[in-house]
């Protein structure tokens, strides 16, 4: 943001602050970031579609009025989603890279530009990460790697459920390394983007450029690495990328929703390499950590939230950080839209749909076994037995598949629940049913029916 635009925006904010409540100001107006101003049009960046809709319908006229007071001119206001702007920026960067194709080094290698580092989220730093018992080990491992890249643990493999902070730690590592060494070549990418770039490289006959891009870096961070499983060409390419970086003593950081040994259809040679360094897990946050996360979020966003409301949220939302912070924002939005103070009663109203779903009976391996046994007119003991006749073996595989899909239980634990079977048996069952689901409509219907009954109890 240039100085003139910044000054204009700050003056407008001071006017608006006196016209609406503190909650509304902090929730909606402060979420805007000015992008540019020209031809009597002010362009503002907003975080999501919901916020965009509220600003457009409730606060647009107020923004226009404030700008008129400051500048004596009438401006139009245009709102843009941050995600759209990021995509536009990526496209611009891609075009720049394409223009550089003919100006690469003599050996044809691509120099990783500073723009690659721009893919890191500025909000995801070690300073903004809330440490608790559930993530202390993963945080310590990440900090050790950031302080001594390729010397502490290589690779670092972080795993855990959705929304628990894996991506936050990966970005924090990248930021820390760049802060200590601005010339470091740090690349963060999702496994999906890695795969898509590989596909495009093959299609456009640019394999060498693709390899140079990922093999001539100091730090490679790949998120959701489990998604390369089952993709033979991607696994082949990443295997050689991993080897090239490791041999050159470059740092590799990977994240996944499960440990390497539990990723189905992952090649053994990759699985073993993922286990070369340190494997660190992140568990769902305990109550104290959930409270700390909520207080941190409230402080950062400038929100005045009573302690008893945060206790209520932390008691009701236990699964992950994303849902926890989302619940807080939902309550603040509900307060602003209904023009009521934030209270436990208001929080209960705002979260009633979310909480009612959360408090339904959890799906367990036992409930899955009961449902599958009832469907096939079997006993649970049959599913746990060592019998391998098809009328028992196939329902057992279905129950194992559902256990992997609908519970957070590890593969070895699932195997134990089915008569002490090995985790590889569970992987085989999961892969077989997954494959059959692609063509067997009867199986699809049955799986959907059982899943619906289990999740709506």
Curated annotation (Swiss-Prot):
Gene Ontology CC terms, in alphabetical order: cytoplasm; plasma membrane
One GO MF term: ATP binding
Region (Domain I, interacts with DnaA modulators) location: 1-75
Keywords (A to Z) from UniProt: ATP-binding, Cytoplasm, DNA replication, DNA-binding, Lipid-binding, Nucleotide-binding
InterPro entries: AAA+_ATPase, Chromosome_initiator_DnaA, Chromosome_initiator_DnaA-like, Chromosome_initiator_DnaA_CS, DnaA_C, DnaA_dom, DnaA_N_dom, DnaA_N_sf
Coiled-coil residues: none
Domain IV, binds dsDNA: region residues: 336-457
Record's subcellular location: Cytoplasm
Keyword Lipid biosynthesis belongs to the record: no
PANTHER family: CHROMOSOMAL REPLICATION INITIATOR PROTEIN DNAA
Assigned protein family: Belongs to the DnaA family.
Function description: Plays an essential role in the initiation and regulation of chromosomal replication. ATP-DnaA binds to the origin of replication (oriC) to initiate formation of the DNA replication initiation complex once per cell cycle. Binds the DnaA box (a 9 base pair repeat at the origin) and separates the double-stranded (ds)DNA. Forms a right-handed helical filament on oriC DNA; dsDNA binds to the exterior of the filament while single-stranded (ss)DNA is stabiized in the filament's interior.
Name of the protein this chain belongs to: Chromosomal replication initiator protein DnaA
